[in-house]
Amino acid sequence: MHTIEEKAAAFVRLLQIMDELREKCPWDKKQTFESLRPNTIEETFELADALLKGNKKEISKELGDVLLHVIFYAKIGS
């Protein structure tokens, strides 16, 4: 198990990567709340399917995808 410090450092690194992508990646730069919405809906349905199946590995993966979208929306809004 990773320490809280390691988990915090990993989360900070994720935020840094998202900052860099938003600044430098052409696709990321042009995304809006509206353009990202269909992808978010798809990820949410994938999470729902994993939950219904009780597949912990898939649930974890899909939660990561949804979290990434939450962070992306926060970056768009900032």
Which residues does each predicted region cover?
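Extended low-complexity intrinsically disordered regions
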Residues: 1-59
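Hydrophobic/aromatic-rich structural module bridging two neighboring secondary-structure elements via a short loop
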Residues: 60-63, 67-78
